[in-house]
Amino acid sequence: MAVGKNKRISKGKKGGKKKAADPFAKKDWYDIKAPSVFEVRNVGKTLVSRTQGTKIASEGLKHRVFEISLADLQADEDQAYRKIRLRAEDVQGRNVLTNFWGMDFTTDKLRSLVRKWQTLIEAHVDVKTTDNYTLRLFCIAFTKKRVNQNKKTCYAQSSQIRQIRRKMREIMTNMATSCDLKELVKKFIPESIGREIEKATSSIYPLQNVYIRKVKILKAPKFDLGKLMEVHGDYSEDVGTKLERPADEPVAEGVTEVIGA
């Protein structure tokens, strides 16, 4: 019988088992700050890898998009069906300053609106605000029974649908092009555009559940820190007080204390 190495017997690895590194050890938490149009300003936290060499942490945070329920932003559970998108525009200290970047409805809310015996009317339009944001607004509406109507159905005719759609586009364009993005977001929250459409189209056919169901930002202007600070209103970061000193004023030379001398 030949004597030799038994290859089946496994050798122990050199150095033993490697200790698993904690993935959070090299990351930092940053606070997400919502614009001043919302009631709740501190909306959450986000993680980012620490600055290492040329890879700067703040650059990794910029243009990150957060989706938050309007119920959390307004502290109002009745607004839970709206989802607001906020985009990180600037980082100051440990705070991420965001701006509005779109809006959508939850799927369950949209499904609950669609019912039998009524007509669904949709319209969308591209608008440009006074501060050069290009948005696409999507509107949804449903017909309802007229006063004292006995008939079960409330279907609108094709000509009426076209008229209503034209009116929707007209109102959305007028209300969006006459204000900046901050003012427009203020109109989205209480659904003032939907109410205006409902009022204007009542002579054509009575409508119910009129909503701006979706907002997409197609084009944003060049980043301006001054405009962002206006959006955040009362936000202030803890910074040192600037000292004014004349150029010709001599600087007093004090004695430098050496620690451990």
Swiss-Prot record:
Residues 1-20 are annotated as: Disordered. Transmembrane segments: none annotated. Its main location: cytoplasm. Residues 1-18 have a biased composition (Basic residues). GO terms for biological process: translation. Keywords: Cytoplasm, Ribonucleoprotein, Ribosomal protein. One of its GO terms (cellular component) is cytosolic small ribosomal subunit. It is found in: Cytoplasm. HAMAP family: Ribosomal_eS1_euk. Belongs to the eukaryotic ribosomal protein eS1 family. This is Small ribosomal subunit protein eS1z. It comes from Vitis vinifera (Grape).
